[in-house]
Amino acid sequence: MIQMQSNLDVADNSGAKRVQCIKVLGGSKRRFAGVGDIIVVSVKEAQPRARVKKGDVHRAVIVRTKKDVRRTDGSVIRFDSNAAVLVGKNEEPIGTRIFGPVVRELRGKGFMKIISLAPEVL
């Protein structure tokens, strides 16, 4: 469950290390975002000489959350950290690699590029 002011790790090689959610997209009064949702983020920490700089505003897809993700079969999956992947306007990832596992729910939301780049899909 991600809301405004939430800090997330970045799970790709775009150059950003930490980002902060500044808007949850999808509705005028929407407060929370979960796995597979798109948010607007501000880069708070970045690597030097990277594609993205500190202070840049980008869209991101949430790939891991500390909050439980419930499946239809009754199983639950949760992670140790909140993480996102930076995407462009056409919802394609900015980076060329994804670090760490991502959830299977991204497939249903149409993020096949992220699924194919991820080393593990849970």
UniProtKB/Swiss-Prot annotation:
InterPro entries linked? Ribosomal_uL14 (IPR000218), Ribosomal_uL14_bac-type (IPR005745), Ribosomal_uL14_CS (IPR019972), Ribosomal_uL14_sf (IPR036853)
UniProt record, GO biological process: translation
Q: Does the keyword Translocase apply?
A: no
Electron transport as UniProt keyword: no
- Any GO molecular function: structural constituent of ribosome
User: Which UniProt key words apply to this protein?
Assistant: Ribonucleoprotein, Ribosomal protein, RNA-binding, rRNA-binding
Q: Which Pfam families does the UniProt entry name for this protein?
A: Ribosomal_L14
* One GO cellular component term noted in the UniProt record for this chain: cytosolic large ribosomal subunit
Record-stated family: Belongs to the universal ribosomal protein uL14 family.
Tell me the subunit arrangement.
Part of the 50S ribosomal subunit. Forms a cluster with proteins L3 and L19. In the 70S ribosome, L14 and L19 interact and together make contacts with the 16S rRNA in bridges B5 and B8.
Q: What does this protein do?
A: Binds to 23S rRNA. Forms part of two intersubunit bridges in the 70S ribosome.
The protein here is known as: Large ribosomal subunit protein uL14
Q: What organism does the UniProt record list as the source?
A: Novosphingobium aromaticivorans (strain ATCC 700278 / DSM 12444 / CCUG 56034 / CIP 105152 / NBRC 16084 / F199)
Gene this chain is encoded by = rplN
